[in-house]
């Protein structure tokens, strides 16, 4: 499956050039943002870690081994890219124990930047946002057009697609999910089951969003829509009055799409019909999610880009800095600007 099939159309037109992303880890930097005041004491040791070329799960295993504790006592808020330079929090439960020597966990791929104590463990999804610094190298494109598009994106946001990495190489996770769904079975391994169910929900969401981008309604509330604020998981129905709420114009309030689960789409009118129609088109995946006991949730269709700035440190390098809510993908912003090409190759686009 190609990127257009997995995501959908761009909102702002064709790519304005080509570039390379992740030639080195420093080209893709992520800083986890937590809004948690630490107590300074308690049985949980919180660890601020910088890692490069290392996934979050492997970092957790290294911390557990160095601390001499079971892996289950190590927690983190979210998974971060392996092919990146990332800084994120971990917590280790150490009831009645002193701070362990964690130096054995460190090498050129993992550094412990600071530690503190807290009364609670780090929960999944506890981070409020992620800060990104991206360097698009070997950039070849129209800088004036890039600047104009970025100014527009800063004002209007972008479609909140799940990025292609959610679906595996060439959409392999979607293929696997469809295979399990056709057999009406679930993988026994918990991590595989979770990954494929998440893939299925993300794929259905992207299909709905793709249709809204195609008809120009992805950033416009319609009667029957379910609306949500940027950082809220709750939603409410849109009538005529809600469709002209000024908070829509300032990117505080957004229409939402389905993360499929039990029951019909809770939207109404034409929005309900669209969502039900797309789910019916993927009936095996829809029924598989329902039978797995997934509850219906919503995700905002429009992604506001916080603190967006950009400059060119070198003529062929475009550097972007911005903040996204947790669970959103930096690569969908890049996609609205340029086609990515493999390292060392700038004459043909790479679909991944």
Swiss-Prot record:
Domain TRUD: start-end pairs: 157-303
Superkingdom assignment: Bacteria
A GO BP entry: tRNA pseudouridine synthesis
Keywords: Isomerase, tRNA processing
Key word Zinc present: no
CDD domains: PseudoU_synth_EcTruD (cd02575)
HAMAP family: TruD
Family: Belongs to the pseudouridine synthase TruD family.
Name of the protein in question: tRNA pseudouridine synthase D
Source organism (scientific name): Pseudomonas fluorescens (strain Pf0-1)
Lineage: Bacteria, Pseudomonadati, Pseudomonadota, Gammaproteobacteria, Pseudomonadales
Gene: truD
